[in-house]
């Protein structure tokens, strides 16, 4: 059964939440065999890396796959990350680029 977790609002608002919808749980159980967690600071670092090195502006949820790949780079398996979304508040982006606390 789905579990309810603590949720803290952040700029990574496109993913996450308190739980999976009950109707979706059977599908999730079939398709997902695990999950990885990163901090908001790790996602901010991924947003900054994408902006500075690749000139790509990704929203928090869009940069989360890169944050996970960087946090778990010790695995020997190839990784592909889908980076998406540019819906990031300009002030939040500026704070990320200045490496300020969010």
Predicted regions and their residues:
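PLP-dependent amino-acid enzyme catalytic core
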Residues: 1-102
């Amino acid at each position: 059964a789905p579990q309810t977790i603590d949720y803290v609002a952040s700029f990574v608002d496109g993913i996450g939440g308190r739980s999976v919808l009950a109707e979706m749980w059977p599908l999730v159980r079939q398709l997902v065999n695990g999950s990885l967690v990163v901090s908001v600071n790790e996602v901010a670092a991924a947003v900054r890396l994408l902006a500075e090195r690749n000139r790509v502006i990704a929203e928090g949820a869009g940069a989360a796959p890169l944050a996970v790949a960087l946090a778990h780079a010790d695995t020997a398996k190839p990784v592909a990350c889908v980076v998406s979304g540019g819906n990031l508040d300009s002030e939040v982006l500026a704070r990320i680029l200045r490496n300020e606390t969010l």
